[in-house]
Amino acid sequence: EAAQIENIWAENEVLYLYDKKEQYLADRFSWQLRADEGYHATELEGGALAGVESDVDTDGKFGLIAHGWRSFTDPQRLTRELAQHFTRLGGEILNAEVSRIESAASRPKCVHFTDGAQRDIDKLVIAAGCWAGRLLKDIGIRIPLAPLHGYHTDIADSGVSLSRPVLYASGGFVNTPVESGLRIAGTVEIAPLDPEPNFRRAEVLVEKAKRSLFPGLKSTQGSQWIGTRPFMPDTLPVIGPAP
């Protein structure tokens, strides 16, 4: 809100789809856990499900409308405009790669860059995702941080119109309307940091989407992307001051 970024935040519902109701019933325990925490969903099947998203093949499927979701319409624009807001507040953005962090008396004192430059510091915030583990070692902190890689394809001229994200529970991926078109995303790849992308993973998702959800998908080609997200064994985020 402070950055005053317009039309970036969408409050919507999510359509969960299962190929068969039996698959949903087998997954009922997880839905009950959600309900216990105040996360509500409306069950749909037959004609009631068919009228929710006209471009989605719902024949024989079982669905749920999950309420209270929010999503970003363009994460890239969000990041760019947050960076602009940071500079308006007086911040400086250095386009440089950090090689190491120098510390003294167990406190960080200097950031060194791969080009030989360095910057003395009084305080340091490390928000480097999966790469944070490498930097934290320089100041004597070790956390069991692992990288998980996900893939997506953005299709600009898909011929598919969605009013909400569609999470295909039976296929393990999500289809989201974004400013750039239709985004088909999912999978978890366990691999080292900075792996060689295996974009066949993204292609498989698009093929599944066309075969199982979107018979009218005009194109299976689009811009492909791999993203790395940090993962802790207890799945909880690591946020707060260092000890």
Segments and roles (model prediction):
Residues 1, 8, 100-103, 107-108, ...:
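Active-site substrate-recognition segment that forms the wall
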Residues 1-78:
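Rossmann-like flavin
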Residues 40-42, 92, 110, 142, ...:
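Conserved beta-strand segments of alpha/beta enzyme cores
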Residues 43-53, 71, 92-109:
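A conserved short coil-to-beta-strand element within the FAD-binding core of flavoproteins
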Residues 67-83, 130-131, 201-208:
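Mid-domain beta-loop-alpha active-site segment that forms a flexible
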Residues 86:
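Hydrophobic pocket-lining residues that define ligand/cofactor binding sites across diverse proteins
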Residues 90-91, 182:
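Short, conserved active-site loop motifs that form the nucleotide-linked donor/cofactor pocket
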